[in-house]
Amino acid sequence: MTNLQDQTQQIVPFIRSLLMPTTGPASIPDDTLEKHTLRSETSTYNLTVGDTGSGLIVFFPGFPGSIVGAHYTLQSNGNLKFDQMLLTAQNLPASYNYCRLVSRSLTVRSSTLPGGVYALNGTINAVTFQGSLSELTDVSYNGLMSATANINDKIGNVLVGEGVTVLSLPTSYDLGYVRLGDPIPAIGLDPKMVATCDSSDRPRVYTITAADDYQFSSQYQPGGVTITLFSANIDAITSLSVGGELVFQTSVQGLVLGATIYFIGFDGTTVITRAVAADNGLTAGTDNLMPFNLVIPTNEITQPITSIKLEVVTSKSGGQAGDQMSWSASGSLAVTIHGGNYPGALRPVTLVAYERVATGSVVTVAGVSNFELIPNPELAKNLVTEYGRFDPGAMNYTKLILSERDRLGIKTVWPTREYTDFREYFMEVADLNSPLKIAGAFGFKDIIRAIRRIAVPVVSTLFPPAAPLAHAIGEGVDYLLGDEAQAASGTARAASGKARAASGRIRQLTLAADKGYEVVANLFQVPQNPVVDGILASPGVLRGAHNLDCVLREGATLFPVVITTVEDAMTPKALNSKIFAVIEGVREDLQPPSQRGSFIRTLSGHRVYGYAPDGVLPLETGRDYTVVPIDDVWDDSIMLSKDPIPPIVGNSGNLAIAYMDVFRPKVPIHVAMTGALNAFGEIEKVSFRSTKLATAHRLGLKLAGPGAFDVNTGPNWATFIKRFPHNPRDWDRLPYLNLPYLPPNAGRQYHLAMAASEFKETPELESAVRAMEAAANVDPLFQSALSVFMWLEENGIVTDMANFALSDPNAHRMRNFLANAPQAGSKSQRAKYGTAGYGVEARGPTPEEAQRAKDTRISKKMETMGIYFATPEWVALNGHRGPSPAQLKYWQNTREIPDPNEDYLDYVHAEKSRLASEEQILKAATSIYGAPGQAEPPQAFIDEVAKVYEINHGRGPNQEQMKDLLLTAMELKHRNPRRAPPKPKPKPNAPTQRPPGRLGRWIRTVSDEDLE
């Protein structure tokens, strides 16, 4: 973030470290300028699961020191038992004096099984509680989920094998360094004496007040009577002190008091015990003071303390059984936790509870804590420290992002797999130049984009040192061509060269540069400092493109622009190509600075911003438009570009504007429209078309030529966009030559633009074209060569053929190929390609073509019946079906075109049920059940057939019902004893009857008459 020389990536290291602590530490970019060193400290613990299989891990995610948390196991009696504290690998107070926590993340999961266990069982609940540990009322496994209502601060029932990740997010900023309680030099009689310097910043003070004139009364007992004078919740994991005094009054002589303070841990056990008074005698009739002055160092606090208790033991000197003892007490105590009110020290806390894990399993806690550390004087001799860098833009951006963390899906507890998946999203958040693709998928892009616009540019007006950062993020990078390329105000001067939407009819200068200057894509290098055609040029490098933001749900049409230069009057040179978008309205804020302020008027008086102001645009538009360069396009959004492209003109842009004015789409149309494609034999420059084609392919777009004639169909954007939803790359050659969805006015506008004098060819180019046409008319061989050239270019194999020619200089391989190629109509040709002509593969229509032909057939049939509203587009929207009877009734009654797929139930009469006769049902059942001559169908099957006739209102079964009836018949035949007996099979050994045969063709039968 602070390295402003790298203009291609603007990373905010602080927020990257916050969201992904494993990427390492980063200095907090606030105004606390202390020399420090950055350090990452790991924490790794393998915690053994207790007998009940349940436990609780308490994390202090924001604690600025070595303490990370504590582990408790659940006992069979339902109580928690402290196991151990969780610390960083290095004891920071041993080497460092001061500390600031930058970021921290911890992961809890289990991947090991004890002996005899073959499945990894158990689940985890986790919650971040915006309070202190002592304030939790229910720490049971399920009760933790009620600790907060914020869905981003709790997760439940995560498998222990998957694990959870705890992320530390700051609750405050611009914090000072905290003293770590490090040892200080000290000399004493006791060699074990330790002196430490504890934090005194932001202490937390608990005040405990005894009720005035608290009355105690009891009878004497041997050993004294013990009562709890008070018990209060406190929170402490660092050193604390207790101060104050209590006043006791009594009227009984010889009373003796003893007082003890107990510091109790989260599990209810006593951690520290301090005797305040022992055998303290009370004087009757006076105020007896009992002072409290305790100091508990950090090293004695072996587990988190959550409460304090004061017990008083009352006895009597020489007391006898039955003697009365009474006194009253008043006063207050103050418990001070050193550094306890530092943001993150004691609150919030994150609790991770696991349940039903196999006994003896190991739960692993692993994580990293990143710190800013100030070493002690001894270590500072060998450790280099640096000042923190003040970066208000980065700090402001971080604050705004985390203030919207609930809306941006940034949680404090995560399933580990989900957190890993979100790392790419976090990288987008940390990179101010990222296009926010993943954020857009989650729906967070608008918020982050608004934060970027607010957080960084405003800073330059308050803090001048941050102005370069503001320009880089807000208004765009000043593309530095050198010192002379900027005016006194710091604003880059615009170039006078013009980018043109180049086609076969246009050859215009894009970047004004003399010979000797090398212009390659966006890299502009010059050897000296001349002024060329108004461009101030100086030694230097034109810096790379910087993406603006994405525009969501914006209708747009796209077209390519070829960036050219001119070496001489006849040979324009294509250098690069860029996709532009036509957006409705005045949207100069989306344009790069090099395009702003330039516009052209249309014939209807409207403006097109981003066009060069050359005359009048020969189009009639109904509104203003803006053309902007883009770097990428998605389903419903476009990513803008900051490339320093000057204003443009050209046929491709005019065609895209015409489409935009007619269709007015709600989302970008994923087709690159260009005027460089045609089918009339016009000579085209190969490099221009290839450059546009490559540019369209990089974005996954089709390169579409204009419709060359008017089609009598109305504009139907829904049908148009339905045909091209996924933009395959195999439609590159004139896919829209016969576009049936081009409305008449768009065609007329296109022809008007092509006929305008402004878009005629240059005289030199016209002369060259006429010369080539004349040569082709005179020389048939040259005409054939031009045809071959156009065929190669149209099919996109110019480069392939050129490479083939280099490998076959004598054309031997080509001659052999042509000699052995199948001829039109030959057997091999028909076997391979069907009956199509030579070299043309005979194929059936594509599904889209077949569907379109079907829609046309239905429409023509409806037209013959006088139903003129059923156009092919209407049929397509109606589910590729003709109008239903209800739609026809609606049209006949209202003479309004019915909406496709509308039922219009009000125009349909209820269908009368027609009952089939029993004879008809029996005949159908017999026909379905079996062949004639077999046994009659059973009554159960006849009933099934009758049900079908009843459902169909007297009509017979449809195909699906017929299948069901046939299956039913087969089942009944197999289990019906009344089925017809099988036909007897012929016996193989039985003699066959001799058929009456003829004696012969020439043998005459002797009759009785002959014998007479």
Swiss-Prot record:
GO biological process: proteolysis
A Pfam family: Birna_VP3
Chain positions covered by the region annotation Interaction with VP1 protein: 1003-1012
Biased composition (Basic residues): 975-986
Keyword Cell membrane: no
GO MF terms, alphabetically ordered: metal ion binding; serine-type peptidase activity; structural molecule activity
PTM characteristics: Specific enzymatic cleavages yield mature proteins. The capsid assembly seems to be regulated by polyprotein processing. The protease VP4 cleaves itself off the polyprotein, thus releasing pre-VP2 and VP3 within the infected cell. During capsid assembly, the C-terminus of pre-VP2 is further processed by VP4, giving rise to VP2, the external capsid protein and three small peptides that all stay closely associated with the capsid.
Site note Cleavage, residues: A441, F442, A487, A488, A494, A495, A501, A502, A512, A513, A755, A756
A single Gene Ontology CC term: host cell cytoplasm
Chain intervals for the UniProt region annotation (Disordered): 969-1012
Positions bound to a divalent metal cation: D30
EC annotation from Swiss-Prot or TrEMBL: 3.4.21.-
Keyword list, A-Z: Capsid protein, Host cytoplasm, Hydrolase, Metal-binding, Protease, Serine protease, T=13 icosahedral capsid protein, Virion
Domain Peptidase S50 residues, every copy: 513-755
Function: Capsid protein VP2 self assembles to form an icosahedral capsid with a T=13 symmetry, about 70 nm in diameter, and consisting of 260 VP2 trimers. The capsid encapsulates the genomic dsRNA. VP2 is also involved in attachment and entry into the host cell by interacting with host ITGA4/ITGB1.
Protein name: Structural polyprotein
Species of the source: Avian infectious bursal disease virus (strain STC)
Organism lineage string: Viruses, Riboviria, Orthornavirae, Birnaviridae, Avibirnavirus
